[in-house]
Regions:
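Short amphipathic alpha-helical "interface-anchor" segments enriched in bulky aromatics
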Residues: 171-205, 210, 214, 218-222
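Active-site beta-loop-alpha junctions enriched in small/polar residues
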Residues: 4, 37-41, 62-64
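Short, conserved catalytic/metal-binding motifs centered on acidic residues
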Residues: 32-41, 57, 162, 184-191, ...
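Short acidic, glycine/serine/threonine-rich loops at helix termini
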Residues: 1, 11, 43-49, 68-74
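An anionic, glycine-rich sequence signature occurring as long contiguous blocks
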Residues: 58-187, 193, 292, 296-300
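Short, surface-exposed basic-aromatic patches at helix termini and helix-loop junctions that form
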Residues: 26, 46-55
Length: 300
């Protein structure tokens, strides 16, 4: 969606979501997930999306008085402690954490500091005003300690809500899935600064739209390289899956340096052409496996 930056992000969001759904269906996708923040919770469309049977949605909901009141009215037994998984796996020896310099400076200068104590999750049914049926509402409760300098002032609860028609996944999975939506912000950043797709170098809307589409093809090709990278069953299966996941999340600058900017000598002999790679990096083997996988035409 290409429009002036002074327009609200959720304007006509339901229309564009419907267009995206139609496009995915034409492409053959059997199930579709809609994931967005509070501004994209189009309550007048939830019933229609739910009736399709193939659309699952997870939207953030504003922590208004009604939802906060329902969450506070839940019995304590309805809440479960949320344990977040580690961001990465330590493969060698775990090292001691370095000093949090920012935390120390905040305390020394007497600034207000918010410290997360723990997180709890619960769920209940909630029917928005414009809906004809209730939906599953997952509540995330964070206990925050408010400090100023070396003194603790008070503790408070902050609530976050997620509305969904997914009745299968656990409340923890719904929260993690919604938090993973933040990767989309990284995608926008890469489209802007990685492949320079949002620079708007021309003087009219249609030309800038065409430039954006053509420039974003570079990022699309990177994504397809990650998706098409073969995974060999057996000893190297987990390593190959990790490589695929890394390429999908890799910044475009790193992808360009690791898999595109490779010095290569081209030798023409008889009836064949030989490509001799003149240097090696940790991703050279992945490039060769990808080349072998793409050598033959893909069949549907």
């Amino acid at each position: 969606m290409n429009r002036p930056g002074n327009r609200p992000s959720h304007e006509q969001a339901d229309d564009y979501l419907d267009k995206g759904i139609a496009l995915c269906r034409r492409a053959g996708f059997q199930s579709i997930l809609l994931d967005g923040d509070t501004d994209f919770m189009q309550t007048w469309k939830l019933d229609a999306w739910d009736r399709t049977g193939y659309i699952t949605f997870v939207f953030g909901a504003d922590a208004g008085k009604t939802l906060v009141g329902k969450a506070e009215a839940l019995p304590q037994t309805a809440w479960r402690r949320l344990e977040r998984p580690d961001r990465y796996e330590v493969r060698t020896q775990e090292r001691a954490k370095p000093e949090n310099v920012k935390e120390r400076v905040v305390r020394e200068r007497g600034y207000k500091n918010l410290i997360l104590q723990w997180e709890d999750v619960a769920e209940f049914d909630h029917q928005p005003h414009l809906c004809q049926q209730p939906y599953r509402m997952v509540a995330l409760r964070k206990k925050i300690a408010v400090e100023r300098g070396m003194e603790r002032l008070f503790e408070e609860y902050r609530y976050f809500f997620y509305i969904t028609n997914d009745r299968v996944g656990t409340a923890e999975e719904i929260v993690f899935q919604s938090n993973d939506r933040c990767h989309q912000e990284n995608l926008i950043e890469q489209l802007k600064n990685g492949v320079q797709a949002m620079r708007n170098p021309l003087d009219n809307l249609h030309s800038n739209w065409a430039y954006m589409v053509m420039s974003s093809l570079a990022w699309t090709l990177k994504a397809w390289c990650g998706l098409l990278l073969p995974v060999t069953p057996g000893r190297w299966e987990s390593h190959h899956r990790e490589q695929r996941h890394t390429i999908l999340r890799m910044e475009f600058k790193r992808f360009r340096n690791m898999m595109l900017r490779i010095p290569c000598q081209i030798v023409k002999t008889g009836r064949r052409i030989i490509y001799r790679i003149m240097s090696w990096n940790p991703w050279t083997s992945s490039l060769l496996r990808l080349t072998e996988a793409m050598y033959y035409p893909m069949r549907c």
